[in-house]
Amino acid sequence: MFGPNVVVATAGHPILPELREQGYQYNAPVHIGKNCWIGAGALIMPGITIGDNVVIGAGSVVTKDIPSNTVAVGNPCRVLRKINDRDKEFYFKDRKIDWDEINNNL
């Protein structure tokens, strides 16, 4: 799931002005795993791999690979914590997930 204004960049340019003047650029694929949530305004740089079940915070700039089952935020984006059992119990602060209601609506 992508929030609004997410950028996934696959092209970059070298630092040396002589190469940039000649129009040189490079391309590097970005890999995003399953069940990821990329927050609004996040920027994912070329060559990055984001594992499965990852949450990237809004406005983050992802410059390094992010491992699976983590929450990562910031500029530069860093792993804040692993996704844990509390995440299966609460959806926001102290608001509990009503699993009976969810399962009845499947």
Residue ranges and their predicted role:
Residues N75-L106:
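Terminal amphipathic alpha-helical/low-complexity segments used for targeting or macromolecular assembly
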Residues A40-K64:
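Beta-rich strand-turn-strand
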Residues V6, H13, T49, S60-V61, ...:
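Flexible glycine-rich beta->alpha loop in the catalytic core of nucleotide-sugar glycosyltransferases
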Residues R20, P67-S68, V73-P76:
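Acidic, glycine-centered active-site loop in nucleotide-sugar glycosyltransferases
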Residues W37, V55, V71-V73:
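Short-chain dehydrogenase/reductase
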Residues M1-I48, I83-N84:
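Flexible, glycine/small-residue-enriched loop-and-beta-strand segment within the central core
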Residues K34, D52-N53, S68-N69:
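Short acidic capping loops at alpha-helix termini that bridge into adjacent secondary structure
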